[in-house]
């Protein structure tokens, strides 16, 4: 069945991606009949498939089934909106405004949600969701306190959260850029960190500079400069010719600019005539700036705006003094400016090739140069932008003529050595130079080395040149490393990302955990939660027998690890070839949820070496996992006490009566409880369901018994196991 589901998912995914593109196309270029036909097909598919998907997701879900349900719902809704819009023959502005409104719509915002989470004891928390990271963080926090809330309340909260995730999912394979942050580690990041040697670092410090690639997967992009030019050549056109053939003086001017840009790309010097317009604009800007600065003297307070204008005037004047003509123009040319000019030229070429061509969304709403730094362009990618920025940074730094001078001046050793060499070099054979050498003695020979001043000077000059080369080489290497590092940061931040699998995988595991708990409780076990006088006496008998016994200290470590495993959330339990220890899995579970040190201390102090039975046995009868009114911290403390009581009492019971009764958790069930129960795969033991109405289930000889009192359960197991031994 999974293969058929994957095949349907692939087809629906492709259709949803194409529907997402229709929202940015010229409405006059869209085939209305094709849209209506696809809309009818999707409506029929939803009528037949969506009820089955909902039924499956309410029994045992998977990441694929959850995302497919969202894609079907969103595609049906998007096609319905498109069909209604296209039926009215809207203009381009009306079409784009309806699909991409510039003003917020009335009514509740689909990009925000508030989810109420009920816990035992009447405590509840309200979680605000607005980003994909908020959903993922909520999953991690719920994973750390899964034993503090009932399955029904958890499924209701998870249902609202998954529905909010579906609204963010939309139909596009690209998530909204403002809907996620890549610097927040997800549960998969913590799982990967568990595989790495920490070298004494905490997992939080290891993930401090993480670039999460699981919630939204980064797509490696390649530079696209030159791809569209090749397409133009195949069509028998040239980008420059197309740009100049637009007609009119404006096209002629643009054609001249295009020719200038092309020659800039080839780095050919020009006579500077093409800079007349830019030079005039620069002079006007400089004159207006100087007029603003004219009234400022040293007696006035310094203004940040005036300081910025003064700096700009200073650096622009330094650039003017750098040279004239084509050489200065070539050296001051920016790779980013060439990129913007290339984008504009290709847009003009596209308009010239397809006269009367459709005007799409990016034609009516082009990004500004500053915005294009973050989103790229139609004819250049983010990688092209980052490469241009790197070239501009390195070129700007290397153009400074005083680069080596600054290095020399900052080095005290070189300054001293240079003074000695220059003083001696002016009068190398004279007494004055000899006295300077004798007074300074920068390099005093040892042993039988030559004492000729000429050799000393020659050696010093060689050392000076080598030292300068080393400084220059190291400086350039550090500059290159710095630019590459920041380039990677920009690439991680600005690169295109598509939907990852982490969110739906976490949602499926959490939903399945609470579904299995609800299914397990409702399997039709024999209900022995009513208690009674006989059950009270049986419970008292077991308690009295355990009170005089002590735990085996040799097995205390394994008992503690078992306790840790029972309170480790389903997202942190690993079923892989390289599982981490249970205590490490719990530590990562708490770190991922953002637990504070004092909260971890409460867990580590639950079991100590000298613990006795009176420290954990509850004197109340038939009240296991009964939480009174209190806040979440008190609820968590009480649930931990109940889980500790089950672990220690069953361990002591096995030691006293030489039994091998196992305490299992609902989190260890990897498949549907209904399927495992029907096939008889449920093993014997005590199952901790974390449900207040039926917390303990004893499975023995393929029969189940529900208890609210732990010691009545142990007495029942003692009787059933004794009958089995007697029959043998």
UniProtKB/Swiss-Prot annotation:
The keyword Acetylation does not apply. It is found in: Host nucleus. Residues 247-257 have a biased composition (Basic and acidic residues). Associates with TRM2 and TRM3 to form the tripartite terminase complex. Interacts with portal protein. HAMAP family: HSV_TRM1. Belongs to the herpesviridae TRM1 protein family. Disulfide bonds: none annotated. One of its GO terms (molecular function) is zinc ion binding. This is Tripartite terminase subunit 1. The lineage of its organism: Viruses, Duplodnaviria, Heunggongvirae, Peploviricota, Herviviricetes. GO terms for biological process: viral DNA genome packaging. The keyword Secreted does not apply. Component of the molecular motor that translocates viral genomic DNA in empty capsid during DNA packaging. Forms a tripartite terminase complex together with TRM2 and TRM3 in the host cytoplasm. Once the complex reaches the host nucleus, it interacts with the capsid portal vertex. This portal forms a ring in which genomic DNA is translocated into the capsid. TRM1 carries an endonuclease activity that plays an important role for the cleavage of concatemeric viral DNA into unit length genomes. Pfam families: PRTP. Keywords: ATP-binding, Host nucleus, Late protein, Metal-binding, Nucleotide-binding, Viral genome packaging, Viral release from host cell, Zinc, Zinc-finger. Residues 239-278 are annotated as: Disordered. It comes from the Viruses. It comes from Equine herpesvirus 2 (strain 86/87) (EHV-2). GO terms for cellular component: host cell nucleus.
